[in-house]
Swiss-Prot record:
The term 'anoctamin' was coined because these channels are anion selective and have eight (OCT) transmembrane segments. There is some dissatisfaction in the field with the Ano nomenclature because it is not certain that all the members of this family are anion channels or have the 8-transmembrane topology. Residues 915-933 have a biased composition (Polar residues). This is Anoctamin-7. GO terms for molecular function: chloride channel activity; intracellularly calcium-gated chloride channel activity; protein dimerization activity. GO terms for cellular component: anchoring junction; cytosol; endoplasmic reticulum; plasma membrane. Residues 377-420, 521-550, 610-714, 785-843 are extracellular. Keywords: Cell junction, Cell membrane, Cytoplasm, Endoplasmic reticulum, Glycoprotein, Lipid transport, Membrane, Transmembrane, Transmembrane helix, Transport. Belongs to the anoctamin family. InterPro entries: Anoct_dimer, Anoctamin, Anoctamin_TM. Residues 43-101, 902-933 are annotated as: Disordered. Residues 1-355, 442-499, 572-588, 736-763, 865-933 are cytoplasmic.
Length: 933
């Protein structure tokens, strides 16, 4: 790209640097001598590079040899005050500006930290192979750091001696010129005009309209303003808001993104061997950690007139991450400013979903209370409990005894809590609730994407993944931007994805095998308990087998989850997805398919298959020689509710314990390990340490995938099986209130600061949620039709007795005479069959009613959902107006080329006779392979 010469008039820094690495990376040389040396090196490498090398050498001879970005300050002045630019307004701010401008005489601010440890004692004890590996790692590190310096980064190394271990900290910062170049290269959006922050919640507006005090409102200081913004261009620098202040023009998150882009694309060896980028160095153990610095400590200083101003991290802790703020709105703009759009969108989704759970939890609790009231007035339940020895039931398993139906009184009453007419209303309510939730989230997401300048991120801004760029066999023009980018043939990717799908099918088959083994376990356990000789245990044999089977199933689920996530990550890397968004979407889909089968297979079996293929006395069906399971005395719905509570609540409790304990244990171990070495080295306990040392003692950020997966699986439990457990939304709400503060505390207090990542939505998770919503409608329709007593009761009311007297006897069939003769006694079992074991006319009538109910239920819900989709716009009208206004301002601000360059000039042309001849063109940028390898 060619830059207009006059564009640099607004820069308050040194002259423009010469670039030296690949066109894909856009890194910098320190001076013209470096450029000449790289040009001479490339001349000996390959014939295709010779012309460019000679061009570089001729251009270097025509220019002076002034050092353009000096990154070699005197040793005595290397050490200084490091930290975040959150304090740029303090006295150190001018020094920070000088560093970013390239001045060697001023201390620099560290934007990023690389860490590695060297065990001197272990090095002396290593064998030759291990020593060679250590030497290779050292060479890679030195090459990587040299290439970072060549890229124009300030690299200052701080070494901390801890006994036999030396911890090395490489403190990185970028010059103003590097920041400007990469801001344009990465298509970052920067502000043109400030707007008042108009962030609001619909509940706040409703309470204000009603005149009710809003207890959810939290006054958070230093509210980030909103901006009209557009893509940054260096030749339009003066038109951007705040461009005259090099300290604050680029926020800390923008600088972190730029530095991480450089780190991700800087080679440390031969690119063809994939020796490229920070990800590989971390994976190989060459570096121990790489992270941007926090603003400072999260604990707030004592209040008083001399108290310092809170940094961004302290503001988030004080007004967001504390447990006492559980009932306050989240400061999403502050979260976005400190952690980036991706993290902020996760917390926005989590808060939005939790808020919508409140009405669902209220209605579900009311439905459950209605069930509690109906237990004592339900005539069929009263008949069952008062039947005494009137109904002797057939054995539930091969060696189980005959039993009296009256002994199942407690289970029948418990089943009535969940199985009544209110459940039908609640299922319909939850289906529409899920549709509205997603519709209004689309509006919320569009509003946040506009406010945070990432509406078109995936289409125009997102760059190819560094790992993809290093491994792609060819280049091709991007259809959106027209720029050449690394390319991997779609046909080859499709073949790899097909092979990966085979692995997914195999893993799903493993889950099904585990499910079958649990079914067999339940059947065998019921037989063992019934033979135990204990009358009390024998009476509860089926329930004990079911409960222990649920626990075993949960253990299988957790173990298989860990194995499959690692396998899915390997498969997704092999598929060569171009962008990080596509990579994450493919990885997410693989894991979710597996987790869906893993978590939902057992509830689906209980809801739709258990007790359906049992047969009848004298002709029972078997699986591997074991009689198929029957539903317990209270029916399958109460057993499904039990399974849901064990898996859903058990998983939530285990996850929350892990989220509390594991980061604390890891953080404690990291601090103990580092500080114990210092004590052995003789360092005093009260000795101060740099902020990079404090941050290295924290836990690495583990990303958002597990957090999203947990919430999406919870959404599935809340919607797909809600007919069996109206209390599921309540448990989800209570969990999420804890989850928000747990996650907030992890990010603010326990995690190293993650690199700010951009995103315009929650990605493929939204489509998964939409799929679960459609599946929930069908699932609840079949659940109400085939697993609940709602339709048999309604049929009995219409055809026999409105008060349901005699319904219990209506649902019980008599064992065939052959079975009674073989056992010298008759018995009853739950089915609509005649005395010969054939289906009765009532069964076929009910089957027709059930199928009709399924069709009507799902058509009504889908029709209403479609109508709501049409009535509720995906993008609010106010946002559409703001987008048009922003486009208009951007067009006015960036399309005045006739004034700048004359009538015939274009925005990328340079006028002749310019004071500063631009050397910033693609022709000055050699291949990345010309860096040190």
């Amino acid at each position: 790209m060619r830059m207009a010469a006059t564009a640099w008039a607004g820069l308050q820094g040194p002259p423009l640097p010469t670039l030296c690495p690949a066109v894909r990376t856009g890194l910098y040389c320190r001076d013209q001598a470096h450029a000449e040396r790289w040009a001479m090196t490339s001349e000996t490498s390959s014939g295709s590079h010779c012309a460019r090398s000679r061009m570089l050498r001729r251009r270097a001879q025509e220019e002076d040899s002034t050092v353009l970005i000096d990154v070699s300050p005197p040793e005595a002045e290397k050490r200084g005050s490091y930290g975040s630019t959150a304090h740029a307004s303090e006295p150190g701010g001018q020094q920070a500006a000088a560093c970013r401008a390239g001045s060697p005489a001023k201390p620099r601010i560290a934007d990023f930290v690389l860490v590695w440890e060297e065990d001197l004692k272990l090095d002396r004890q290593q064998d030759s192979a291990a020593r060679d590996r250590t030497d290779m790692h050292r060479t890679w590190r030195e090459t990587f750091l040299d290439n970072l310096r060549a890229a124009g980064l300030c690299v200052d190394q701080q070494d901390v001696q801890d006994g036999n271990t030396t911890v090395h900290y490489a403190l990185l910062s970028a010059s103003w010129a590097v920041l400007c170049y990469y801001a344009e290269d990465l298509r970052l959006k920067l502000p043109l005009q400030e707007l008042p922050n108009q962030a609001s919640n619909w509940s706040a507006g409703l309470l204000a309209w009603l005149g009710i005090p809003n207890v959810l409102l939290e006054v958070v200081p230093d509210v980030p303003p909103e901006y009209y913004s557009c893509r940054f261009r260096v030749n339009k620098l003066p038109r951007f808001l705040g461009s005259d202040n090099q300290d604050t023009f680029f926020t800390s998150t923008k600088r972190h993104q730029i530095l991480f882009e450089i780190l991700a694309k800087t080679p440390y060896g031969h690119e063809k061997k994939n020796l490229l980028g920070i990800h590989q160095l971390l994976a190989e153990g060459v570096l121990s950690a790489a992270f941007p610095l926090h603003d400072g400590p999260f604990k707030t200083p004592p209040e008083g007139p001399q108290a310092p101003r809170l940094n961004q991290r302290q503001v988030l802790f004080q007004h967001w991450a504390r447990w006492g703020k559980w009932n306050k709105y989240q400061p999403l703009d502050h979260v976005r400013r400190y952690f980036g759009e991706k993290v902020a969108l996760y917390f926005a989704w989590l808060g939005f979903y939790t808020g919508w759970l409140l009405p669902a939890a209220v209605v579900g609790t009311l439905v459950f209370l209605v069930g509690c009231f109906l237990v004592f007035s339900d005539i069929p339940t009263q008949e069952l409990c008062g039947s005494k020895d009137s109904f002797e039931m057939c054995p539930l398993c091969l060696d189980c005894p005959f039993w009296l139906l009256s002994s199942a009184c407690a289970l029948a009453q418990a089943g009535r809590l969940f199985d009544h007419g209110g459940t039908v209303f609640f299922s319909l309510f939850m289906a529409l609730w899920a549709v509205l939730l997603l519709e209004y989230w689309k509006r919320k997401s569009a509003t946040l994407a506009y406010r945070w300048d990432c509406s078109d991120y995936e289409d125009t801004e997102e760059r190819p993944r560094p790992q993809f760029a290093a491994s792609a066999p060819m280049t091709a023009p991007n259809p959106i931007t027209g720029e050449d980018e690394p390319y991997f043939p779609e046909r080859s990717r499709a073949r790899r994805m097909l092979a990966g799908s085979v692995v997914i099918v195999v893993m799903v088959a493993v889950v099904v095998m585990c499910l079958v083994s649990i079914i067999l376990y339940r059947a065998i356990m019921a037989i063992v308990v019934s033979r135990s000789g204990n009358t009390l245990l024998a009476a509860w044999a089926s329930r004990i087998a079911s409960l222990t089977g649920s626990v075993v199933n949960l253990v299988f689920i957790l173990i298989l989850s860990k194995i499959y996530v690692s396998l899915a990550h390997v498969l997704t890397r092999w598929e060569m997805h171009r962008t990080q968004t596509k990579f994450e979407d493919a990885f997410t889909l693989k894991v979710f398919i597996f987790q869906f089968v893993n978590f939902y297979s057992s509830p689906v079996y209980i809801a739709f298959f258990k007790g359906r293929f049992v047969g009848y006395p004298g002709n029972y069906h078997t699986l591997f020689g074991v009689r198929n399971e029957e539903c317990a005395a209270g029916g399958c719905l109460i057993e499904l509710a039990q399974e849901l509570l064990v898996i859903m609540v058990g998983k939530q409790v285990i996850n929350n314990m892990q989220e509390v304990l594991i980061p604390k244990l890891k953080g404690w171990w990291q601090k103990f390990r580092l500080r114990s070495k210092k004590r052995k080295a003789g360092a005093s306990a009260g000795a101060s340490q740099g902020p990079w040392e404090d941050d290295y003692e924290l836990v690495p950020c583990e990303g958002l995938f597990d957090e999203y997966l947990e919430m999406v699986l919870q959404f599935g439990f809340v919607t797909i099986f809600v007919a069996a457990c109206p209390l599921a939304p309540l448990f989800a709400l209570l969990n999420n209130w804890v989850e928000i503060r747990l996650d907030a505390r992890k990010f603010v207090c326990e995690y190293r600061r993650p690199v700010a990542e951009r995103a315009q939505d929650i990605g493929i998770w939204f489509h998964i949620l939409a799929g679960l919503t459609h599946l929930a409608v069908i699932s609840n329709a079949f659940l109400l039709a085939f697993s609940s007593d709602f339709l048999p009761r309604a049929y009995y009311r219409w055809t026999r007795a409105h008060d349901l007297r005699g319904f219990l006897n209506f649902t019980l069939a008599r064992a065939p005479s052959s079975f009674a003769a073989a056992h010298n006694r008759t018995c009853r079992y739950r089915a609509f069959r005649d005395d010969d074991g054939h289906y009765s006319q009532t069964y076929w009538n009910l089957l027709a009613i059930r199928l009709a109910f399924v069709i009507v239920f799902e058509h009504v819900v889908f029709s209403v959902g479609r109508l709501l989709d049409l009535l509720v716009p995906d993008i609010p009208e106010s946002v559409e107006i703001k987008v048009k206004r922003e486009y208009y301002l951007a067009k006015q601000a960036l399309a005045e080329n006739e004034v700048l360059f004359g009538t015939n000039g274009t925005k990328d042309e340079q006028p002749e006779g310019s004071e500063l001849s631009s050397h910033w063109t693609p022709f000055t940028v050699p291949k990345a392979s010309q860096l040190q390898q």
